[in-house]
From Swiss-Prot:
Organism: Danio rerio (Zebrafish)
The UniProt record lists the keyword Phosphoprotein: no
InterPro entries: Mitochondrial_sb/sol_carrier, Mt_carrier_dom_sf, TXTP-like
Protein name: Tricarboxylate transport protein A, mitochondrial
The Solcar repeat ranges on this chain: 71-159, 170-256, 266-351
Membrane topology type: Multi-pass membrane protein
C-alpha cells in the first residue's frame, strides 16, 4: 500500500503492561550462549546473541491512543472540514455581532449601545436573515480552516505520542501552535480579510459587493492579492496563540480525565465541557490580538501603517479597554464554537473508523 496511507511505523512488542495492546507479540527468550575459541589457540570467549524481542514489527496506519487509534491525517482533514462547516452555520450570528461591535469605533458616534441593541437594529432593518449577512464568506473559509487545523495537528502530534498514545501537554502546545500557523497562512488570513471587508461593506449606505465571489474579485482588482493578506502578522499571532491555548487546555483536561487509563472513553458531553473551557481560555488570552486583526482587515485598514501602529493608535485614541471590545459576544461564540467542533470532530472520526480502514 502507498506510504501516503501508512505514514507511521510502529513496532509491536510484548505485552508487559496490564493493558493489553492488540496484536502484541510474545516475549522470546534469549538464545543460549555460544563459546567461540580465541585465535591462536588461547582460551575461549563466550558470545551471547542479542535477542529479537520484537519480531512482530510491521507498518501500521494507527496505534492505540487513549482507547482509540491514531487519527490518520486524511481522516482528520475530512472530519475537521465537516465539523467546521456545521459549527459555523450554528454560531455565525454571534460572530456577526462581535464583528459589528469591534468595527463600531468610538471615534465616530457609536451606532450600537450593546449586544442587544445590535441584534435589535439588525433584525429591525434587515430581518433575521440580517444576522447571517456575510455567512458565505465565512463558510467558505471555515471548512478548509478546520480541515487544515486538525490535519496539521495530527501530522505533528502522532510521532510525539508515547507507547500508550498519550500526548505530553508541552507537545500539545507546540502542535497547536503549528496548527494555528498553518491555518493562518493557508486559509484564515485571506478568508478573514474578505469576511471583514464584506460585512463592513454590507453595513455601508451603498454596498459595493453583490456576493462573496464578486467581493473577492473587487478586492483583488483594487488591491491585488496582497489585499487579501492584510494583517498577516496579527493573524499569525492570533491563530497561533489561539490553537496553542485550545489544544493545550483540551489535552491537559483529557489527560487528567483519563488518568492512568488511556482506554477510558470520553462522553460527548465531557468533550463539550472541556472544549468550552479551552475556548474560554483562548478568548481571555488573545482578544486584544483579535481586535487588532479585525481593524487591520477592515475597510479602514489604510489608516494604519502596520500591526504595531494599529495597536498603538487604538491604545492612544481609545484606551486599553478598547482591546477587549466584543469580548462578551466572542466569549459565547468561541465557547460554543470550540465545544461543537471538538465533539463533532471526535464523533466523525469514530464514524470514519468504522467505514474507512487505513491499515
Amino acid at each position: 500500500m502507498s506510504s501516503l496511507y501508512k505514514p507511521f511505523c510502529v513496532s509491536e512488542g510484548p505485552c508487559k503492561d496490564a493493558i493489553l495492546r492488540r496484536g502484541c507479540a510474545p516475549l522470546q527468550h534469549p538464545a543460549a550462549p555460544t563459546r567461540i575459541p580465541s585465535p591462536g589457540g588461547g582460551s575461549t570467549r563466550t558470545f551471547t546473541p542479542i535477542p529479537n524481542i520484537y519480531p512482530g514489527q510491521r507498518t501500521l496506519a494507527a496505534a492505540a491512543i487513549g482507547g482509540r487509534k491514531i487519527t490518520h491525517p486524511w481522516k482528520a482533514i475530512f472530519a475537521g472540514g465537516i465539523a467546521g462547516g456545521i459549527e459555523i452555520c450554528i454560531t455565525f450570528p454571534t460572530e456577526y455581532v462581535k464583528t459589528q461591535l469591534q468595527l463600531d469605533e468610538r471615534a465616530n458616534p457609536p451606532r450600537y449601545r450593546g449586544i442587544g441593541d445590535c441584534v435589535k437594529l439588525t433584525v429591525q432593518y434587515h430581518g433575521l436573515r440580517g444576522l447571517y449577512r456575510g455567512l458565505s464568506s465565512l463558510l467558505y473559509g471555515s471548512i478548509p480552516k478546520s480541515a487544515v487545523r486538525f490535519g496539521t495537528f495530527e501530522v505533528l502530534s502522532n510521532p510525539m505520542r508515547d507507547a500508550t498514545g498519550r500526548l505530553d501537554n508541552k507537545a500539545s502546545l507546540l502542535c497547536g501552535l503549528g496548527a494555528g500557523i498553518a491555518e493562518a497562512v493557508l486559509v484564515v488570513c485571506p478568508m478573514e480579510t474578505v469576511k471583514v471587508k464584506f460585512i463592513h461593506d454590507q453595513c455601508s449606505l451603498r454596498p459595493r459587493y453583490r456576493g462573496f465571489f464578486h467581493g473577492v474579485r473587487e478586492i483583488i482588482r483594487d488591491q491585488g492579492v496582497r489585499g487579501t493578506y492584510q494583517g498577516l502578522t496579527a493573524t499569525l499571532l492570533k491563530q497561533g496563540s489561539n490553537q496553542a491555548i485550545r489544544f493545550y487546555v483540551m489535552n491537559l483536561l483529557r489527560n487528567w480525565y483519563k488518568g492512568d487509563d488511556p482506554a477510558r472513553d470520553m462522553h460527548p458531553l465531557v468533550t463539550a465541557m472541556f472544549g468550552a473551557t479551552a475556548g474560554a481560555a483562548s478568548v481571555f488570552g488573545n482578544t486584544p490580538l483579535d481586535v487588532v486583526k479585525t481593524r487591520m482587515q477592515g475597510l479602514e485598514a489604510h489608516r494604519y501603517k502596520s500591526t504595531m501602529d494599529c495597536a498603538f493608535q487604538i491604545l492612544k485614541n481609545e484606551g486599553p479597554l478598547a482591546f477587549y471590545k466584543g469580548t462578551v459576544p466572542r466569549l459565547g461564540r468561541v465557547c460554543l464554537d470550540v465545544a461543537i467542533v471538538f465533539v463533532l470532530y471526535e464523533e466523525v472520526v469514530k464514524l470514519l473508523n468504522n467505514v474507512w480502514r487505513t491499515d
